[in-house]
Design a protein with these regions (language model features):
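Thiol-based oxidoreductase modules, predominantly thioredoxin-like and allied folds used
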Residues: 32-44
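Structural micro-motif
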Residues: 50-59
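Non-catalytic, surface beta->alpha helical segment in thiol-disulfide oxidoreductase systems
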Residues: 61-85
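Long, contiguous secondary-structure blocks with strong helical propensity
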Residues: 1-4, 32, 82-83
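Short helix-loop-beta junction
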Residues: 27-30
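Generic recognition of short, well-ordered alpha-helical segments
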Residues: 18-21, 47, 51, 71
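Local sequence-structure signature of Cys/Sec-based thiol-disulfide redox active-site neighborhoods
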Residues: 1-25
């Protein structure tokens, strides 16, 4: 099963730590997987930093941008309650 939730983060980001806690908790409650991606590392680092650098942390659900800066747990639960697109 592939992760429905992607969390884009970067090192030293305190909001990223807060977002990770929310994403971990909600995904665990619903039996969903999530993937965390450091936008400063890997072959796509430049493109991801250009796209999301000012909005980090960013969450995607089913490949679509869902939230940035802060993750609302109720909104995330609602999005994950829908069937994947």
């Amino acid at each position: 099963m592939s992760a429905r939730v992607t969390l884009y983060t970067r090192p030293g980001c305190h909001l990223c730590e807060d977002a990770r806690v929310v994403v971990e908790r909600v995904c665990a409650e619903l039996g969903e997987e999530y993937a965390e991606v450091d936008i400063t590392a890997g072959p796509e680092a430049d493109a991801l930093t250009r796209r999301y650098g000012e909005e980090i942390p960013v969450t995607l659900v089913d490949g679509r941008q869902h939230d940035f800066w802060r993750v609302d747990p109720d909104r995330l639960r609602a999005a994950l309650g829908r069937a994947p697109r």
